[in-house]
């Protein structure tokens, strides 16, 4: 590398000399220096001839000499670009001068000044020609405003974690914006993603319309900067063989910097020559190619690798520019963006999975590049999406506004139309309804939707429009399939909301009739508040039922307030009171369980208990009508109903824990004493809040037995949210000591110890154990029964299946009163089921033995699940309930029916006997031995029952 001997001259001397020779003219296609009318052609020719020949135009015309060849032009141009100081000091070759960093910086400064003069004068702060980036700068400004708005919203909401996260993104955006204004290259992946607070779409349209200019600035490698230019986009198709022979002679050829500068100079001179010949189009084209070398030279100066195989060919080998190249460059630039963005999702789950996959890919790319900070950031976002997907699959509501949105993806469920300050449920639901209406609009709007979705890539979307319409029309039935899968839940949700609104309106009407204006207004406001939820539910959107107000209860609905009808005896009135009390208790139980499941967001169980509450209301209306008419008590019966309920102890507060010491069993006897001489008490130690302040107590002394029954309870103080309490129940538990009470001058003697683990309180509100009493580590044979109870589990609600005796009242006929308790003076409060002649054909008859077998098998399954502290599946509980109801109904029919129904039952048993026989034979031939054994066992049950019936 050549070093200067003297001090460097003042900057700009080479530029001044170049300007004097007329080389540095602006060949921009705007026509500032190249007018189309040819007014300055003579001046340009004079400057060019003065440059190459050094004589005035008149002498050249007299001599009749033409312009010099291109080699001379290259030589003169290289001489003009040399520094005068170096010419005076020593003669150096052209390559050494071009490799000098100071001269390159000076030349770039001159070129930047010339381009800035030819362009608009306002942007003075942008010294480099490639610095302006309208697309990226606008995107950064809008993203900056978006993050500022998000920080303000988080500050108002008091969310400090979100404020810190947005503040980090804001600082990153400010640094990137400052870098791009200085003309530095930035990485697109460093831009923080938009926050989904309602202004997401504002950044996406401004980001994608300019794919041709910002792309060379963003890419780390210089190849895209050359290939994205107009002429070079077509060059690789025709010049692969021309670019590759320049690479092998590496030692013989000049360096990459000199080669790039030489090729850039060729294009500049070609542009000047084309302008001299009047071809302004070719001049502008060559000038654009020459300007594309600036980005490559800048990358090379930073030490980045440069692939010279993508170098444009010499100007004379450049293929002619077709008339429609302006529409072609966006195609390769926007094609990757269209492939990266997946098709619009049909469901919320699909949208969440698409965005999670996009962030997983981004995390993998960041890891491959060694950017651990960005990889960890994307992995945290992936974790958020995984939690959201699990919550959505579990049936819980997902707040999509809290999830980041990848670049190029639209916000989920119409959040782009909401304002960041609009936090009401009404606005969110209205926006979601608009989006749903747009997605499910008529077919004549299909042309408008792709344009809105693909507006950044409109040139590439137009040729693909016809094939895209065909899959849409063909996939229309499949697009409607997901709503069918979730139609049951949506229908339950809609029915629940409509029923609750009806209840609130009825309560408002009752309050108005009682002159309770404030109560009527309150219920009316609550009913009006359900309308946005109803609209969203009708459009298939999930709603948060935990915000639905509870159902108002009218005490008069479950009381016999009217006078009894004429002729009603006191015994019948007493039975009416008993039935009313049972119905009221059932209704209260239904409302309690419904409210509990509503708070959990379980719409299925909530709807089930709401229906049971309505049945209780109808039963109460039947009782009232019969009571007013003076009729005997309507036909009533008890059925076995199985429910999934939330186990809770409402009499306990959240800071109470009850310890029950029930009894001891076969406690060990110390030497010298008989079991009848034991005087036993139990003391316990619960190390909370700490070991020094442990809660301790003891039972009373039970004398003269080794199996004492204490039946004592102790209330312990806890703090459910305290970490020390969690640590105490997970690792320590409660320690018990079984002690024999000493007599006079005798100390107490410890018979053994026991330890109760409390980790089961995480998922259960009651722990009941029979502990083994140990002497150190040696079992003593004695046992101690204890129980611990809290209000509700620590981490999740405890669901359990319970079977209740459910009172059902049959409707009273309109004309004929029900004769149930007339002839019988000592009828029970709840009569037996009435016989109905039409029921024989309403339900098919089954073998009672087979039904009992199925019932016993389900009971064993439910018992095993309860012992394992696992919830009983709803389908198992429903199947058990159906079998119980069918057995009860069929026994009642056979007991009250005559000979006809018994004959029908015998014929049905014969058909079932034949069916099970054939099924056992067929399954045995197929190799299904277990199924064949079960079919054979059922056949034997039917045969035994048929024999008993024939006797």
UniProtKB/Swiss-Prot annotation:
Residues 311-333 have a biased composition (Pro residues). The gene is CC2D1A. One of its GO terms (biological process) is negative regulation of snRNA transcription by RNA polymerase II. The keyword rRNA-binding does not apply. The modification Phosphothreonine is found at residues 92, 204, 206. GO terms for molecular function: cadherin binding; DNA-binding transcription factor activity, RNA polymerase II-specific; DNA-binding transcription repressor activity, RNA polymerase II-specific; RNA polymerase II cis-regulatory region sequence-specific DNA binding. Phosphorylation on Ser-208 by CDK1 promotes spindle pole localization and association with SCC1/RAD21. Transcription factor that binds specifically to the DRE (dual repressor element) and represses HTR1A gene transcription in neuronal cells. The combination of calcium and ATP specifically inactivates the binding with FRE. May play a role in the altered regulation of HTR1A associated with anxiety and major depression. Mediates HDAC-independent repression of HTR1A promoter in neuronal cell. Performs essential function in controlling functional maturation of synapses. Plays distinct roles depending on its localization. When cytoplasmic, acts as a scaffold protein in the PI3K/PDK1/AKT pathway. Residues 84-104 have a biased composition (Acidic residues). This is Coiled-coil and C2 domain-containing protein 1A. InterPro entries: C2_dom, C2_domain_sf, C2_Freud, CC2D1A/B, CC2D1A/B_DM14. Residues 637-771 form the C2 domain. Keywords: Coiled coil, Cytoplasm, Cytoskeleton, DNA-binding, Intellectual disability, Nucleus, Phosphoprotein, Repressor, Transcription, Transcription regulation. It comes from Homo sapiens. Residues 346-392, 484-517 form a coiled coil. It is found in: Cytoplasm; Nucleus; Cytoplasm, Cytoskeleton, Microtubule organizing center, Centrosome. CDD domains: C2_Freud-1. Pfam families: C2 (PF00168), CC2D1A-B_DM14 (PF21528). Belongs to the CC2D1 family. GO terms for cellular component: centrosome; ciliary basal body; cytosol; endosome membrane; extracellular exosome; fibrillar center; glutamatergic synapse; membrane. Residues 80-139, 185-266, 306-346, 437-491, 818-841 are annotated as: Disordered. The keyword Transcription applies. The C2 domain is required for the repression. Its main location: cytoplasm. Residues 201-210, 475-488 have a biased composition (Low complexity). It is linked to Intellectual developmental disorder, autosomal recessive 3: A disorder characterized by significantly below average general intellectual functioning associated with impairments in adaptive behavior and manifested during the developmental period. The modification Phosphoserine is found at residues 208, 253, 324, 455.
């Amino acid at each position: 590398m050549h070093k200067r001997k003297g001090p460097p001259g003042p900057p700009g001397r080479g530029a001044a000399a170049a300007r004097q020779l007329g080389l540095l003219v602006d060949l921009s296609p705007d026509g500032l220096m190249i007018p189309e009318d040819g007014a300055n052609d003579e001046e340009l020719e004079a400057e060019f001839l003065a440059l190459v020949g050094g004589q005035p135009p008149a002498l050249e015309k007299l001599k009749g000499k033409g312009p010099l060849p291109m080699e001379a032009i290259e030589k003169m141009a290289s001489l003009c670009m040399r520094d005068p100081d170096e010419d005076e000091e020593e003669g150096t070759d052209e390559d050494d001068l071009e490799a000098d960093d100071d001269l390159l910086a000076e030349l770039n400064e001159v070129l930047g000044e010339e381009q800035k003069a030819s362009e608009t004068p306002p942007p003075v702060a942008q010294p480099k020609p490639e610095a302006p980036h309208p697309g990226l700068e606008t995107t950064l400004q809008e993203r900056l405003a978006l993050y500022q708005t998000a920080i303000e919203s988080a500050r108002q909401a008091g969310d400090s974690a979100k404020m810190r996260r947005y503040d980090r993104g804001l600082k990153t955006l400010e640094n990137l914006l400052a870098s791009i204004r200085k003309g530095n290259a930035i990485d697109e992946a460093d831009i923080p993603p938009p926050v989904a607070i309602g202004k997401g779409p504002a950044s996406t349209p401004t980001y994608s319309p300019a794919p041709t200019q910002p792309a060379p600035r963003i890419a780390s490698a210089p190849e895209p900067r050359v290939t994205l230019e107009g002429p070079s986009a077509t060059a690789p198709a025709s010049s692969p063989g021309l670019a590759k022979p320049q690479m092998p002679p590496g030692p013989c050829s000049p360096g990459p910097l000199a080669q790039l500068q030489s090729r850039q100079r060729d294009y500049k001179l070609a542009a000047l020559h084309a302008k001299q010949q009047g071809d302004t189009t070719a001049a502008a084209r060559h000038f654009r190619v020459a300007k594309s070398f600036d980005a490559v030279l800048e990358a090379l100066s930073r030490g980045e690798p440069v692939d010279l195989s993508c170098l444009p060919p010499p100007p004379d080998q450049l293929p002619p520019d077709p008339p429609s190249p302006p529409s072609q460059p966006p195609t390769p630039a926007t094609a990757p963006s269209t492939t990266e963005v997946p098709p619009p999702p049909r469901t919320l789950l699909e949208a969440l999975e698409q965005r999670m996959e996009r962030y997983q890919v981004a995390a993998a790319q960041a890891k491959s590049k060694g950017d651990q900070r960005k990889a960890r950031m994307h992995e945290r976002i992936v974790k958020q999406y995984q939690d959201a997907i699990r919550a959505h699959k579990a049936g819980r509501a997902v707040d999509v506004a809290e999830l980041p949105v990848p670049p190029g993806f639209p916000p989920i469920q119409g959040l782009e139309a909401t304002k960041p300050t609009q936090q009401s449920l009404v606005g969110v639901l209205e926006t979601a309804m608009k989006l749903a209406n747009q997605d499910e609009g008529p077919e004549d709007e299909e042309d408008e939707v792709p344009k809105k979705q693909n507006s950044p890539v409109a040139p590439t979307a137009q040729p693909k429009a016809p094939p895209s319409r065909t899959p849409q029309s063909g996939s229309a039935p499949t697009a409607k399939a997901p709503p069918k899968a979730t139609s049951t839940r949506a229908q339950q949700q809609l029915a629940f909301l409509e029923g609750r609104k009806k209840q609130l309106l009825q309560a408002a009407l009752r309050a108005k009739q009682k002159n309770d204006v404030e109560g009527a207004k309150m219920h009316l406001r609550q009913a009006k508040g359900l309308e946005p939820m109803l609209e969203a539910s009708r459009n298939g959107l999930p709603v948060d039922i935990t915000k639905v107000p509870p159902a108002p209860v009218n005490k008069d609905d479950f009381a016999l307030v009217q006078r009894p009808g004429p002729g009603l005896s006191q015994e019948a009135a007493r039975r009416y009171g008993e039935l009313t009390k049972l119905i009221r208790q059932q209704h209260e139980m239904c409302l309690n369980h419904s409210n509990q499941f509503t708070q959990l967001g379980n719409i299925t169980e909530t709807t089930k208990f709401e229906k049971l509450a309505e049945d209780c209301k109808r039963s109460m209306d039947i009782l009232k009508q019969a009571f007013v008419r003076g009729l005997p008590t309507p036909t009533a019966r008890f059925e076995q109903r199985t429910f999934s309920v939330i186990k809770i102890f409402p009499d306990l507060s959240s800071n109470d824990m009850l310890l029950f010491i029930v009894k001891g069993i076969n406690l060990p006897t110390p030497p010298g004493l008989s079991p009848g001489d034991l005087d036993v008490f139990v003391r316990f130690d619960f190390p909370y809040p700490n070991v020094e302040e442990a809660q301790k107590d003891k039972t009373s002394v039970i004398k003269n037995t080794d199996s004492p029954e204490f039946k004592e309870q102790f209330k312990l103080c806890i703090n459910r949210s305290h970490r020390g309490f969690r640590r105490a129940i997970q690792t320590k538990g409660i320690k018990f000591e079984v002690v024999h009470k000493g007599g006079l001058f005798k100390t107490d003697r410890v018979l053994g110890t026991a330890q109760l683990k409390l980790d089961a309180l995480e998922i259960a509100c009651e722990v009941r154990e029979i502990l083994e009493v140990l002497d150190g580590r040696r079992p003593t044979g004695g046992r101690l029964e204890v129980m611990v109870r809290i209000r509700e589990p620590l981490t999740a609600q405890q669901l359990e299946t319970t079977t209740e005796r459910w009172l059902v009242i049959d409707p009273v006929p309109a004309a004929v009163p029900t004769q149930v308790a007339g002839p019988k003076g000592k009828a029970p409060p709840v009569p037996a089921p009435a016989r109905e002649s039409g029921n024989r054909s309403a339900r098919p008859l089954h073998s009672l033995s087979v039904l009992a077998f199925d019932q016993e098998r389900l009971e064993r399954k439910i018992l095993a699940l309860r012992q394992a502290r696992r919830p009983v599946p709803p389908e198992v509980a429903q199947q058990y309930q159906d079998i119980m109801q069918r057995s009860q109904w069929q026994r009642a029919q056979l007991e009250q029916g005559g000979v006809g129904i018994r004959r029908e039952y015998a014929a049905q048993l014969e058909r079932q006997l034949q069916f099970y026989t054939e099924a056992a034979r067929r399954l045995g031939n197929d190799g299904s031995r277990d199924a064949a054994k079960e079919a054979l066992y059922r056949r034997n049950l039917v045969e035994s029952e048929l024999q008993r019936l024939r006797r």
